[in-house]
UniProtKB/Swiss-Prot annotation:
Gene for this chain: accD
Pathway: Lipid metabolism; malonyl-CoA biosynthesis; malonyl-CoA from acetyl-CoA: step 1/1
GO biological process, one term: malonyl-CoA biosynthetic process
Localisation per UniProt entry: Cytoplasm
Zinc finger (C4-type) stretch: 29-51
Function: Component of the acetyl coenzyme A carboxylase (ACC) complex. Biotin carboxylase (BC) catalyzes the carboxylation of biotin on its carrier protein (BCCP) and then the CO(2) group is transferred by the transcarboxylase to acetyl-CoA to form malonyl-CoA.
Reaction catalyzed: N(6)-carboxybiotinyl-L-lysyl-[protein] + acetyl-CoA = N(6)-biotinyl-L-lysyl-[protein] + malonyl-CoA
PANTHER family: ACETYL-COENZYME A CARBOXYLASE CARBOXYL TRANSFERASE SUBUNIT BETA, CHLOROPLASTIC (PTHR42995:SF5)
Species this chain originates from: Vibrio vulnificus (strain YJ016)
Family classification: Belongs to the AccD/PCCB family.
Protein's name according to its UniProt entry: Acetyl-coenzyme A carboxylase carboxyl transferase subunit beta
Example of a GO cellular component annotation carried by this entry: acetate CoA-transferase complex
Highest taxon in the source lineage: Bacteria
Amino acid sequence: MSWLEKILEKSNIVSSRKASIPEGVWTKCTSCEQVLYHAELERNLEVCPKCNHHMRMKARRRLETFLDEGNRVELGGELEPQDKLKFKDSKRYKERIAAAQKSSGEKDALVAMKGELLGMPIVACAFEFSFMGGSMGSVVGARFVRAVEAAMENNCALVCFSASGGARMQEALMSLMQMAKTSAALERLSAKGLPFISVMTDPTMGGVSASLAMLGDINIGEPKALIGFAGRRVIEQTVREDLPEGFQRSEFLLEHGAIDMIVDRREMRQRVGGLIAKLTNHKSPLVVSVNDSPNEAAYSVPEANEKG
């Protein structure tokens, strides 16, 4: 064997030990496809640091990072969906509920909490899109109404983060009824002179967009969020026309007056807090003017629990 063959033979030795990387350490941006360190992405509130894409966020984590730490109380957490119609399509509704609860870690598609935002009392709720597409059923309607009632009892503002495909097909008329139920509850809130701020995230569609999501005193969209009633393809097939670029995105809706503003998720606490302070004439030392330089306390993000 020549000296060259000996060197090549040694270089082909492969270690039997494989480097193991724990699952979930790295993730990929769904927009620019950059590989991201998951802990960094979480610290950035699920916003890609490379392209600024706002990824979908878990409802519980959204509320825990939006509200101040401490004094957060969940509303309607004991409510669970019931299969009153014994509905079955390709699967039984009961089976779909069980699967959604296991995968999402939530009992239904809306989480509601009362707490404080920058020192001001507030009630907030958020849709869990991973639970059957954030669809609105009886429990979602009931929890939202409880949130409205809590806001009236505490004489404070209500904020809702929407992320939904619409009404829940498996609950039929009982699901559609929630559109009227939630709208009527918001009318009572308005009659008491309390503000409702609706934040529409990606996606907000169907019966949710046609009811509570568009009834805010101020309607906010996250950047590039899909917001509408029917899908683009359905509309194009109906009107037999090509729709413009960016149709149903929050930037398009802002340009055409359908929403009031677009707010980056990382600035949501301060911007919404500033709006609530003005609407309720509440003077909080943590609220600064939008035109002022942000202070560190106002923009700090509260810690979320492990479940979020």
